[in-house]
């Protein structure tokens, strides 16, 4: 089954647009685990177990594991997610971007070592830095397009004077991803929830692509405006929440609190879709 098929099935089965991001920070763990990087797997597995029926995807952020020499725990977590939620796709948040020969190794890491269903990438180095990932049939690749961080304006909002209509860089990325780069229907886009009007603009260029949308929750994105904008064109929607779910409680009830937070976010997104 392809990543896109898995995403659509999980969205329907769990009635959810919610992605839970797995960004483990040991300093924020419950008291019994706090500061202990060897407990990263235990913490994340408990979150997965508590939310697996509420999400359409999980998104482990590789830096939060690598910084603590916890790649082995990430491998174990990937296997656990496969066992307890085989219908839920896993997006490895790596934001890789490098020349083709190096990209081949990053693709091997994402899809062979970790067994991810999709990966996040930077398109800055062009199509030949993306193609090694697309060699993995059925896997997904999300290109950074219009991100939620303030510094995204430095490059993404700049206009390309040499192209017809002088599009913004993020608009050009969306056009390429919808069109000539999407040779096997594997691409999606990362678009931040803090700029709903620009999600609408992205949808003009990429109506059918899946959108991975961080920024709802801790980053302050408006759920109703985000869902309304993302639904234009009918492409799949993945709305990520990380900290608001992971750290809903720093007590022993952290997993139950994470479930409650995920339920509330899923309901908010469902209400937004119905508005």
UniProtKB/Swiss-Prot annotation:
A family per Pfam: OMPdecase
InterPro entries according to UniProt: Aldolase_TIM, OMPdecase_AS, OMPdecase_type-2, OMPdeCOase_dom, RibuloseP-bd_barrel
Active site, per annotation: 95
SMART domains found in the cross-reference section: OMPdecase
Enzyme Commission designation: 4.1.1.23
GO MF annotation list: orotidine-5'-phosphate decarboxylase activity
Alphabetized PROSITE patterns for the sequence: OMPDECASE
Keywords: Decarboxylase, Lyase, Pyrimidine biosynthesis
Listed PANTHER family: OROTIDINE 5'-PHOSPHATE DECARBOXYLASE
UniProt-recorded name of the protein: Orotidine 5'-phosphate decarboxylase
Gene label: pyrF
């Amino acid at each position: 089954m392809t990543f896109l098929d898995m995403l659509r099935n999980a969205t329907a089965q769990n009635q959810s647009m919610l992605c839970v991001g797995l960004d483990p920070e040991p300093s924020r763990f419950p008291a019994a685990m706090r500061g202990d990087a060897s407990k990263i797997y235990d913490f994340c597995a408990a979150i997965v177990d508590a939310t697996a029926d509420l999400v359409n995807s999980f998104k482990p952020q590789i830096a939060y594991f690598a910084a603590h020499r916890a790649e082995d725990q990430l491998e174990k977590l990937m296997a656990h997610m496969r066992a307890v939620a085989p219908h839920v796709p896993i997006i490895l948040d790596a934001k890789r971007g490098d020349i083709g020969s190096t990209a081949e190794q990053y693709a091997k890491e994402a899809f062979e070592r970790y067994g991810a269903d999709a990966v996040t990438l930077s398109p800055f180095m062009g199509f030949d830095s993306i193609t090694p990932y697309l060699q993995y049939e059925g896997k997904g690749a999300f290109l950074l397009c219009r991100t939620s961080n303030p510094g995204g304006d430095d490059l993404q909002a700049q206009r390309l004077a040499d192209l017809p209509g002088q599009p913004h860089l993020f608009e050009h990325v969306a056009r390429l991803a919808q069109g000539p780069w999407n040779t096997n229907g594997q691409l999606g886009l990362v678009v931040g929830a803090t700029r709903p009007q620009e999600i609408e603009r992205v949808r003009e260029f990429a109506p059918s692509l899946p959108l991975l949308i961080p920024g709802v929750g801790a980053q302050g994105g408006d759920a109703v405006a985000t869902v309304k904008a993302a639904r234009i064109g009918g492409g799949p929607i993945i709305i990520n929440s990380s900290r608001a779910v992971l750290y809903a409680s720093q007590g022993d009830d952290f997993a139950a609190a994470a479930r409650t937070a995920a339920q509330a976010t899923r309901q908010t997104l469902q209400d937004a879709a119905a508005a």
